[in-house]
């Protein structure tokens, strides 16, 4: 989708370097951009806003995930400068601040798979609670849950 939107702007070589995958968390998009395309980050951000109609903000991930809270540095490249959004997954709603806590929508299938393994009466310890996604998904069952 992104490569198609930029086909008249980027050269074929630049298009090949473009990372076509991005994370969409509510109305926020987080995109990785190779160093060779940093000078075109605003154009890439604008193209994403135009392609993803519910998106209001596009951030460039300018650092890898790091630190105790596994956060990443984000730089606004298009849209509104807000890092908090509502995210929906498996009939649950979450308010997530993508700048303050690690969150990956790519793990939704894994969170659902693991939560389906939990049986009533079990004790579950979630050692890496983050924003609480896994814990809230499993809280629908009758068990003891500790989130750290």
Regions from the language model: what does each represent?
Residues 1-148:
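SAM-dependent transferase fold signal centered on methyltransferase-like domains
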